[in-house]
Design a protein with these regions (language model features):
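C-terminal beta-strand-rich structural cap/linker in extracellular carbohydrate-active enzymes
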Residues: 615-638
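Carbohydrate-binding surface patches
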Residues: 560-595, 603-605
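Aromatic/acidic polysaccharide-binding cleft in carbohydrate-active enzymes
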Residues: 220, 454-542, 557-560, 565
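Beta-strand-rich recognition/accessory modules
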Residues: 48-53, 87-90, 171-248, 291
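Acidic-aromatic substrate-binding/catalytic surfaces of carbohydrate-active enzymes
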Residues: 2-83, 139, 285, 289
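Extended, loop-rich substrate-binding clefts of extracytoplasmic carbohydrate-active enzymes
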Residues: 54-110, 192-194, 198-201
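Polysaccharide-binding surfaces and accessory modules of carbohydrate-active proteins
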Residues: 105-189, 603-611
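Catalytic domains of carbohydrate-active enzymes, especially glycoside hydrolases
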Residues: 264-297, 305, 309-313
Length: 638
């Protein structure tokens, strides 16, 4: 049976919803799944999204079942109406009646929510996303609930706490001569800097985080909210061109060393990891990031497994160790050190984190009882003398930004990221690279030139700091907070992996880990995937190419369309190697003026259809390279 194109690109047969364009005059928006995205005036993005969202008690998304959708296109307006039904994990139902009106200079999104019985939720209502590119650091005016006005700026570096609270309206200059006011009605709104989670937006949301959650919407009681966007044109404005432009890439040399590539190991995948241990050496990974959690029952057997994997692969070992912090720290860490010694495992480095820090502490909440990080780090250094110590967070930058590790005790700082905390659609996942640039920039401002490691970071979520569990995804859908994501297994995952490495390259990361060895976060295909079971997934080749370039003199690849194509390069032994990823479902053509003989390797749909065999370099004379949907290219210039 011939695999479908969508399956090869995304690892799933589930199509993304087709957006419905709503427009009046020069104001337009896309309606997808009952929510608005890409709200533009005269071709310029004004808001990234306006969404009517419902979260369950664990911050998981309750998907909306949309019915009775109608769209009326009138001379001066476009009006959409629909009914939505949200279902909680316990079966409770929240019904919503929504109306969206688009005028030439205004947009109104009105929603009325009514539960059939008491409905437990962490959040129910509107979320408004302002874009970050061209907006970060720009002036903004905030009107508060009491009528007072605050003149400020959108945060430049990522703000750990809410930059604005008690918001009634937000006004900013979209482009010269155009102001946009977004007014929220029906509840108390505040803003968070969603770049903390690598979302490409500032989010204004309903219900302050300082209030208790989850909370209950009472049976039969209707909650009414509305968002009103108003455009004020102060001067004549030309329409912004939105047609694709040719992508010319330029190279910037001497960008420092590219990072070593790490691979994550997990005790719950020990059996499969032993079977695939040889793949680590083939890939060229130089570090094993070994997850060790005594609270999850990890002990001597897990450490012996890590030693066996290190012996087979020849890679250096970092023990990613949760510290229970229930007994004296010297006792707990001394016991772990004895087990490590008895196992014969030699540590190249050790990273520690209090177990309670795996869960996020939202703004306004009480911090859980925990020894000071200084004490944890000192105890780790006593238990493991001479072993370089890392710290930070095993969760995400959000938690590191809010609870900053004392760097004076650390040999390096570390954190992970995840692109599907809030949204899991293809566009949002690829837009996370806009924010990832600011994540690494913020880390460098906080920690200076301290050695810096990232990962394991994958599309799927390996732990949920915001609830009791991650989301199971047996049907292979695009689900926020899912513990497996089908796109990891397909071309999309390969493109995402390269784009991640390209985005963080400027931060001169020491070790970058973007995969585990086995399982849903790993390198090896299971049944029902775009490549044959037991074969390397497409991202394996990307990571192997990155490993080949690690330690080489980095080359930055600059384009005018970083939302469409990203890449990096290095020069080794007189050969320039460039890696490029297409972040879109459309073919993209890049033009490279660099002189020299060229060879091209391409991971694309055709490569998958031909069996995903070892990619072969072929001569490529043209300065143009066509990147099919979500393709990854390796260009060698001799």
């Amino acid at each position: 049976m011939t695999a479908s194109r969508i399956f090869l690109l995304f690892g799933t047969e589930e199509p993304e919803p087709v957006p419905r364009r709503l427009e009046a005059g020069r104001l337009s928006a896309e309606l997808v799944g009952g929510n608005l995205r890409m709200i533009r005036f005269s071709g310029k993005e004004v808001l990234r999204a306006v969404s009517s969202l419902v979260r369950d008690r664990d911050w998981g998304t309750c998907e909306a079942a949309i019915t009775e959708l109608t769209v009326e296109e009138e001379e001066a307006a476009t009006i959409a109406r629909y009914d939505a039904r949200f279902r909680a994990p316990d079966g409770a139902v929240l019904d919503c009646r929504a109306t969206i009106e688009v005028f030439p200079d205004a947009l109104i999104f009105d929603a009325r929510f009514t539960p059939d019985r008491d409905f437990e939720t962490a959040r129910a209502g509107f979320a408004i996303l302002h874009p970050i590119v061209g907006v970060a650091g720009r002036a903004v005016t905030v009107q508060h609930g009491d009528g007072s006005v605050e003149r400020s700026v959108f945060p430049d570096l990522i703000e750990p706490w809410q930059p604005f609270k008690d918001i009634a309206a937000i006004t900013y200059e979209v482009m010269p001569g155009i102001e946009a006011e977004c007014r929220m009605i029906g509840d108390v709104f505040e803003m968070e800097d969603q770049r903390n989670w690598t979302d490409g937006s500032y989010k204004t949301y309903v219900r302050p985080l300082a209030l208790p959650w989850p909370y209950v919407l009472k049976a039969g009681e209707t909650v009414h909210q509305a968002v009103r966007l108003s455009i004020r044109q102060l001067d004549a404005v030309a329409v912004v061109a939105t047609k694709p432009v040719p992508i010319e890439i330029s190279l910037r040399r001497d960008q420092g060393k590219l990072p070593a590539i790490g691979i994550g190991l997990r005790p719950d995948e020990a059996g499969d990891e032993l079977l695939e241990a040889g793949l680590i050496r083939v890939l060229g990974a130089r570090h094993l990031i070994c997850h060790f959690d005594p609270g999850a029952g990890h002990g001597a057997a897990a450490l012996r497994h890590f030693r066996q994997m290190a012996d087979t692969s020849g890679a250096a070992v970092t023990l990613e160790c949760f510290v229970p912090c229930r007994r004296p720290l010297d006792d707990e860490l001394g016991e772990i050190a004895r087990m490590v010694g008895d196992s014969g495992l030699r540590l190249a480095s050790l990273a520690v984190s209090p177990s309670v820090d795996r869960q996020s502490t939202p703004p306004g909440s009480a911090w859980p009882e925990c020894p000071p990080l200084e004490d944890v780090y000192q105890a780790a250094q006593r238990a493991f003398p001479g072993v370089p110590l890392g710290g930070g967070m095993f969760s995400y930058f959000t938690e590191l930004n809010r609870k900053r590790a004392p760097a004076n005790r650390l040999a390096y700082v570390t954190h992970c990221t995840n692109p599907i905390v809030h949204a899991a659609d293809d566009l949002s996942v690829m837009q996370t690279f806009e924010a990832l640039r600011d994540v690494t920039r913020s880390v460098r401002v906080i920690y200076g030139d301290k050695p810096y490691r990232i990962g394991p970071s994958t599309i799927a979520m390996r732990q949920n700091p915001y609830g009791s569990q991650t989301k199971d995804n047996p049907s292979g859908k695009r689900i926020a907070m899912a513990n497996r994501d089908p796109r990891h297994n397909a071309l999309f995952g390969a493109a995402w992996t390269l784009a991640y490495a390209a985005t963080v390259a400027e931060a001169e990361v020491e070790v970058l880990t973007l995969s585990t060895l086995a399982g849903p976060f790993g390198l090896v295909a299971g049944p029902g995937e775009p490549v044959k079971e037991g074969s390397p997934r497409p991202l394996f080749y990307v990571l192997r190419w990155l490993a080949e370039l690690s330690g080489g003199e980095g080359i930055a690849i600059e384009t005018c369309v970083a939302d469409r194509v990203l890449g990096l390069g290095a020069e080794l032994d007189g050969t320039i190697t460039l890696l490029l990823a297409n972040l879109t479902p459309n073919p993209e053509t890049v033009t490279l003026a660099e002189p020299g003989r060229r060879r091209l390797l391409l991971l694309d749909e055709g490569w998958l259809r031909n069996g995903a065999r070892e990619p072969e370099a072929r001569p490529h004379e043209s300065a143009d390279v066509v990147l099919p949907a979500y393709a990854v290219a390796r260009i060698e210039i001799l």
